[in-house]
């Protein structure tokens, strides 16, 4: 086995003494830094490479800190102005994952870069920490490489805002296997519409 395979096995055992100590120290270190900062290199090179990262020019890693917990509805003094069924303010759950929120914040901050993917690097009782892989699409090393030319096209601008990254697709219910049967047909809305539309064919 190569070195990355051993690293992958280490990260799978997060309750081991080594990983518990490492994650605890790293979380303390990340808390001292700003909520969004550039990392000199990926904390998990094996995971980053599996998600498309290469240690060459044009690739950037940003580390994001996202606050854990539910979402409070932003209304003045709890006045939602509606039916009682929609009066909820405190126990609201956000539709997307914290990982997709981290990708969005990185994409907003680095508007000239494209978000490729992201991965988890740690968490404590208050925060979750993610590292986001971004690509400089105007760098010659990216534009001239056939494997990365696809992300330089304009259609991939701010893909993290439109749920096109891996974390975003997961929140939209898109994927393969029995867990994603609610989105057969492209999206939840399309699947619901097809199942709830009565079609009376002429010859039936």
From Swiss-Prot:
It holds the Pfam family Ribosomal_L15e. Component of the large ribosomal subunit. The ribosome is a large ribonucleoprotein complex responsible for the synthesis of proteins in the cell. GO terms for biological process: cytoplasmic translation. The gene is rpl15. One of its GO terms (molecular function) is structural constituent of ribosome. The lineage of its organism: Eukaryota, Metazoa, Chordata, Craniata, Vertebrata. PANTHER family: LARGE RIBOSOMAL SUBUNIT PROTEIN EL15 (PTHR11847:SF4), RIBOSOMAL PROTEIN L15 (PTHR11847). This is Large ribosomal subunit protein eL15. The keyword Repeat does not apply.
């Amino acid at each position: 086995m190569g070195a990355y395979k051993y690293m992958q096995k280490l990260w799978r055992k997060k309750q081991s003494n080594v990983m518990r100590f490492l994650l605890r120290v790293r979380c303390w270190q990340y808390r001292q830094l700003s909520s969004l900062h550039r990392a000199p290199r990926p904390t998990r090179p094996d995971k980053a490479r599996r998600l498309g990262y290469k240690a060459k020019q044009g690739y950037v890693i940003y580390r994001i800190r996202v606050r854990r917990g539910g979402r409070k509805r932003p209304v003045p003094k709890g006045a939602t102005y509606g039916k009682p069924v929609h009066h909820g303010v405190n126990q609201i759950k956000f539709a997307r994952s914290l990982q997709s929120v981290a990708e969005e914040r990185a994409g907003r901050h680095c508007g000239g870069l494209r978000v490729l993917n992201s991965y988890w690097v740690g968490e404590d009782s208050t925060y979750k920490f993610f590292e986001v892989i971004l690509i400089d699409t105007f760098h010659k090393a990216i534009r001239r490489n056939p494997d990365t030319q696809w992300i330089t096209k304009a259609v991939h601008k701010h893909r993290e805002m439109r749920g096109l990254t891996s974390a975003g697709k997961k929140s939209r219910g898109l994927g393969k296997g029995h867990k994603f049967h609610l989105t057969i047909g492209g999206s939840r809305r399309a699947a619901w519409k097809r199942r709830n539309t009565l079609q009376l064919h002429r010859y039936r």
